[in-house]
Design a protein with these regions (language model features):
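Conserved beta-strand scaffold positions in the cores of enzyme catalytic domains, especially
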Residues: 4, 36, 95-97, 209-212
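Conserved catalytic-core segment of NTP-binding enzymes
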Residues: 111-215, 221
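C-terminal boundary of histidine-terminating zinc-finger modules
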Residues: 225-236
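Walker A/P-loop phosphate-binding motif and the immediately C-terminal alpha-helix
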Residues: 3-41
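Cytosolic-facing regulatory segments adjacent to core modules
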Residues: 79-87, 91, 96-132
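N-terminal phosphate/diphosphate-binding loop that engages ATP/GTP or pyrophosphate donors
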Residues: 28-91
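C-terminal alpha-helix
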Residues: 241-252, 256
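Active-site signature of alpha/beta-hydrolase-fold catalytic machinery across serine-
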Residues: 21, 25, 48, 144
Length: 260
């Protein structure tokens, strides 16, 4: 059964970097194959994984809706669209990537998200893990594109605003009655130990930080050198923190299975 791990959080909190380091962990532990999904219109996950995207869900849909495109004789519209969508999957040895891209028009992402969700449901059964990097904010939750997940990673930077966003996300999960089996709180880009104001803010929400990922100059260095984050060394502080998070998540899943 495919295990789905999805990111949520405000912009600028490092969700893409975190998704990349989660994939790095899975690759290092041979937890493959992996389907990576970039559901952010401002797509960057491919770069972090060292992959090249030629087509996105958005571009496939735009082409498909072009009146000039003809459907081959004997093929239904649905079958042809599915064929074109499969062409948007970037394949590599152990991790494949699907990128949503932009919608049909400015600010229009609803149809691509609906198609993405249905397509992912069919595609995901072929993978051990699905790791989804979502767009900033709460839109993907309100549109229910992150509806059924095993592990929802709620990411905040070391800021009071970020903690408030955590509260908004937790409220929305309850309001929409989303099928989120477990949620983890991650404070990313921490300059040191958590500030008492951050700790107090989390306590007010009735949660704590499941992981604190320190600021890591290596991530900025790799960005400048245009190197995939999956190639970061084991000595990277961020890698160590994410590895610890994943060990905790997978240990909890094993314990849950043993309890039946």
């Amino acid at each position: 059964m495919t295990i789905t791990i999805a990111m949520a959080g405000k912009g600028g909190t490092g969700k893409t970097s975190l998704a990349s380091l989660i994939i790095r962990y899975l690759l290092r532990h041979n937890a493959v194959p992996i389907l990576a999904v970039d559901a952010d219109a401002n797509a960057n996950l491919a770069w972090s994984l060292g992959l090249t995207v030629k087509q996105t869900i958005g571009s496939v849909l735009a082409d498909f809706n072009d009146v000039k495109m003809g459907i081959p004789p004997g093929m239904t519209k649905e079958a042809y669209l599915n064929l074109k969508l499969n062409g948007a999957v970037v394949e590599s040895k152990n991790v494949d990537l699907l990128t949503m891209g932009r919608g049909e028009g400015a600010g229009c992402y609803c149809f691509p998200n609906n198609v993405l969700k249905e397509f992912i449901d069919k595609l995901a059964v072929n993978y051990r893990f699905l790791v989804m990097d979502n767009e900033a904010g709460l839109e993907h939750l309100s549109r229910r594109t992150t509806e059924n997940v095993d592990e929802l990673i709620i990411v905040s930077n070391h800021s009071v605003k970020g903690v408030r966003t955590i509260g908004n996300i937790l409220d929305l999960i309850k309001e929409l009655k989303l099928n989120v089996k477990r949620q983890s709180i991650v404070i990313n880009q921490a300059p040191g130990p958590l500030d008492p104001m951050i700790v107090a803010g989390l306590e007010e929400l009735g949660v704590g930080a499941d992981a604190v990922i320190p600021m890591d100059s290596l991530i900025a260095d790799y960005d400048l050198q245009q190197k995939p984050l999956t190639e970061l060394p084991d000595t990277s502080p961020a890698v160590r923190a994410v590895d610890g998070l994943m060990e905790k998540l997978l240990a909890t899943r094993r314990a849950d299975r043993e309890r039946g």
